């Protein structure tokens, strides 16, 4: 897709996020909106996936570590054709399969249930390790929040991923510097994020997470990186 096509798709996803959260009268629109361009590039350009066969064995995997931004993931999956866009207005409604956090048992295209912050990277690392063990070519992507990486489990997983040289793993950090309690750097600063991942043997790329030229270049660089996992620190607007 061209950048213009990606931008148009991302804007459609943003519209769906607002519609879904408005229908639910609750949810997390901010982090969903800040991640929209990342979601768009992953699902429409980067990942090897098939909406008609969501459990395809050799598909690339995605783990939404910051599971509270489910409206962003759901809107992307619907736009990509995993389920009808009309279902988005049932977000968080009683009886809907689209609840407040992703559920791998009920939502097509969701590879892992998530929501408890800090745990998604560990799951993604496990998936990547299994891929290496089984000699598979699939890649594993996970999206974390900059507030989420205040959780210690993130760094345990990062240490192991770097030690095992999981070059089939890409961690994207949505660096919007906002969490519920305030500015991330004032609540409990994780900065400099890039230096921390580098210390655990990650290849680190800093980008504007709302610029498709930079997003495209970063994922290309990640694919070309061998012998270590990649962390993309994406500065976004929330």
Language-model segments: residues:
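Glycine-rich ThDP/TPP pyrophosphate-binding loop and its adjacent helix/strand module
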Residues: 49-61, 103-238
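Thiamine diphosphate
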Residues: 1-141, 202, 206
């Amino acid at each position: 897709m061209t950048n213009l096509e990606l931008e148009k798709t991302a804007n459609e996803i943003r519209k769906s996020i607002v519609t879904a959260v408005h229908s639910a009268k609750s949810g997390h629109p901010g982090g969903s909106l800040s991640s929209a361009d990342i979601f768009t590039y992953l699902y429409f350009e980067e990942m090897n996936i098939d909406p008609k066969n969501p459990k395809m064995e050799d598909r690339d995997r995605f783990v939404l570590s910051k599971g509270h931004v489910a409206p962003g993931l759901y809107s992307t999956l619907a736009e990509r054709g995993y389920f009808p866009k009309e279902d988005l207005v049932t977000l968080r409604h009683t009886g809907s399969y689209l609840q407040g956090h992703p559920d791998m048992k009920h939502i097509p295209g969701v590879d892992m249930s998530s929501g408890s912050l800090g745990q998604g990277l560990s799951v993604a690392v496990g998936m990547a390790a299994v891929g290496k063990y089984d000699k598979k070519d699939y890649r594993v992507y996970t999206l974390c929040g900059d507030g989420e990486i205040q959780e210690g489990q993130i760094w345990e997983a990062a240490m192991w991923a770097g030690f095992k040289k999981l070059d089939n793993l890409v961690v994207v950090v949505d660096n919007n510097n906002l969490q519920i309690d305030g500015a991330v750097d004032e609540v409990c600063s994780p900065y400099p994020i890039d230096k921390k991942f580098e210390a655990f043997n990650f290849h680190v790329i800093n980008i504007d997470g709302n610029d498709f030229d930079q997003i495209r270049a970063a994922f290309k660089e990640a694919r070309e990186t061998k012998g270590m996992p990649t962390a993309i620190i994406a500065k976004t607007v929330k």
